[in-house]
Amino acid sequence: MVKDILAPGLRVVFCGINPGLSSANTGFPFAHPANRFWKVIHLAGFSDRQLKPEEAEKLLDFRCGVTKLVDRPTVQATEVKLHELRSGGRNLIDKIEDYQPAALAVLGKQAFEQGFSQRGIAWGKQKIAIGATMVWVLPNPSGLNRIKTEKLVEAYRELDQALIMRGL
C-alpha cells in the first residue's frame, strides 16, 4: 500500500490517479523508473534536489505532499473505473478540507474531470476551489504519457510561480 504524505500547512498536495505496480510493490509513490514526477518537481522548483521515490517523506521538508484518487494499484491508470474515481474525488475533498494546503494539483485532466464531475476543463488553475485551497490540473508525469518533460516542467513551474506570488 502506498500511503499518503500529508501534513497541515503545505504549499501543495500533488494527487496522482492511482499507484502503479512498482509503487504498490515498493510502497513509494511514483516509483516506476520511467515516471518523471521526481525530476519534474525538482526542475519546476518544488525541491532543491531530485528526490528518489524512497525519500518521499522528505517532500514535507519542501512543504509538499502526495496523495491519490484511488488506492487500487493497476498496470495503467485507464484500468481505474469511473465509480472509483468519483468515490476518490469525494475522499480527496475530505482530505483537502482536513489539511488545507494552499494548492491541490491533480495530475491528469481525465481523472480530474471524472473524479470531480467536471467537463471540458483546461490545464492549470481551475475555477473551483476546496475552501481556501486552489485547485490545479497538471499533466500526469507517467512515462506512459507522451508529453515532453520540458512541457511538464513548464506546467508545474506555473503552479510553483503562482504559489511564490502568494508568498508561499
Curated annotation (Swiss-Prot):
Any Gene Ontology biological process: base-excision repair, AP site formation
Highest taxon of the lineage: Bacteria
Gene3D superfamilies to which the protein is assigned, alphabetical: Uracil-DNA glycosylase-like domain
Catalyzed reactions per annotation: Specifically hydrolyzes mismatched double-stranded DNA and polynucleotides, releasing free uracil
One Pfam entry name: UDG
Subcellular location: Cytoplasm
EC number: 3.2.2.28
Chief place of localization: cytoplasm
InterPro entries: MUG/TDG, MUG_bact, Uracil-DNA_glycosylase-like, Uracil-DNA_glycosylase-like_sf
GO cellular component, one term: cytoplasm
A molecular function GO annotation: pyrimidine-specific mismatch base pair DNA N-glycosylase activity
Keywords: Cytoplasm, DNA damage, DNA excision, DNA repair, DNA-binding, Hydrolase
Entry similarity comment: Belongs to the uracil-DNA glycosylase (UDG) superfamily. TDG/mug family.
NCBIfam families: PRK10201.1 (NF007570)
Subunit structure: Binds DNA as a monomer.
The protein's role, per its UniProt record: Excises ethenocytosine and uracil, which can arise by alkylation or deamination of cytosine, respectively, from the corresponding mispairs with guanine in ds-DNA. It is capable of hydrolyzing the carbon-nitrogen bond between the sugar-phosphate backbone of the DNA and the mispaired base. The complementary strand guanine functions in substrate recognition. Required for DNA damage lesion repair in stationary-phase cells.
Protein name according to UniProt: G/U mismatch-specific DNA glycosylase
Gene for this chain: mug
